Design a protein with these regions (language model features):
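Non-transmembrane "mature" sequence context
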Residues: 1-110
Length: 110
């Protein structure tokens, strides 16, 4: 897996000019996926745009959760290259391939 930068809740709050509680709400509502890294809640930086969470992420995160993926598993799947997509699913989402990513994610449930 390609090395990615991770941001803590305070990092994200500062970057988006919101409170840490608003960042935690984004995580609770699955606009962002977070994982504990060395005991600290962190989010892959690639899940954010300059304006906020990557808009395509939430629906994909909900689909993965409905398919039985825990947050750590969903994050791993999003960040690791996928043979059927040719790139990591998060990179395909950023490139505008939302429907294709979600089809692949949906197939994982079966």
């Amino acid at each position: 897996m390609e090395k990615r930068t991770w941001l803590t809740v305070p990092d994200i709050a500062e970057r988006l000019d919101v409170s840490p509680s608003q960042v935690r709400r984004l995580i609770e509502d699955r606009h962002l996926l977070a994982s504990r890294r060395d005991g600290v809640v962190s989010v892959p930086e690639v899940f954010l745009t300059d304006e906020g969470p990557l808009p395509e992420l939430r629906g994909t995160a909900i689909l993965l959760g409905d398919s039985g993926f825990e947050n750590d598993e969903a994050i791993r799947w999003l960040l690791e290259p996928d043979d059927s997509l040719g790139v990591a699913p998060i990179d395909a989402l950023i490139a505008g391939r939302k429907a294709e990513v979600r089809r692949v994610a949906q197939a994982l449930a079966f």
